[in-house]
Amino acid sequence: MPKRKKVTIVGAGNVGATAAHWIAAEDLADIVLVDIVEGMPQGKALDLKEAAPVYGFDLNIVGTNNYEETADSDVVVITAGVPRKKDPETGKYPSRDELVKTNQQIVGEVTRQVAKYSPEAVLVIVSNPLDAMCHVALHESGFPRERIVGQAGALDTARYMTFIAMELGVSVKDVHGMVLGGHGDQMVPLPHHTSVAGIPVLELMDRETLDAIIERTRKGGGEIVGLLGYSGYYAPAAATVSMVEAIVKDQKRVIPSAAYLEGEYGYNRLFMGVPVVLGAGGIGTG
């Protein structure tokens, strides 16, 4: 019987815990939830484990405050970091880039621990600002670039397709598109490669309407923060789990993700959202 895969999620907050929920519900892999808050990962892991008889999954789910129990993970999802919260003095929300100083220290320490205990793992970075945190993980881990991948385009693409489906009143299953570039204002949706049941989207709506959808997609994270007072987590977790599934099942799915470029697309030494083939070992060539 083949050994079950093992996925560690660092950061047991909203995104991390929701990702753990869906990994368990899909029976993908054993799960280790890690957080610095004592009791929180243990409690969430136990709560999730108690759902097993209802959902029908049969996995080992552990919550911990140390990294020893994460040893030999196949995939490590890093969600740890300071979230986007309203400043009580200014009433403003920080941009992703304003989080870089604090989160680079957090992600750096997490990455060093992960690399120590799971030297063969694929790292899926979710912490913001995404591109900068991917650089931190690459530098601190010493891993080859193929094993560092950022969750960016998968979420942005999901938002883009959702807004198109809402505008046209069609099933999201019939909308196909892709969002590349940076995670945030620098994202680049591809209108001429967007279709609904094979019909180019610009034959179904005018350019002004599509441009409004693109702008809403760029501001999608901020829209959720403005409504909730904190970052969204259902869609980010779902996008993350789609990447984890592709890796642990070696699906070789093409998923837009932040990858470290060394000459591809004319760019060097930076992380950018591009179409990548995700499978066992991380980013491959198909």
Task: Map each language-model feature to its residues.
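Glycine-rich Rossmann-fold phosphate-binding loop(s) that bind the pyrophosphate
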Residues: 12-13
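N-terminal Rossmann-fold NAD(P) dinucleotide-binding loop
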Residues: 16-17
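Conserved S-adenosyl-L-methionine
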Residues: 25-30, 142-144
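Conserved N-terminal Rossmann-fold NAD(P) cofactor-binding segment
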Residues: 34-73, 82-91
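Short glycine-/small-residue-rich Rossmann-like dinucleotide-binding loops
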Residues: 80-81, 128
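Rossmann-like NAD(P)(H) cofactor-binding subdomain of soluble oxidoreductases
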Residues: 91-161
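C-terminal substrate-binding/catalytic lobe of Rossmann-fold NAD(P)-dependent dehydrogenases
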Residues: 141-147, 155-286
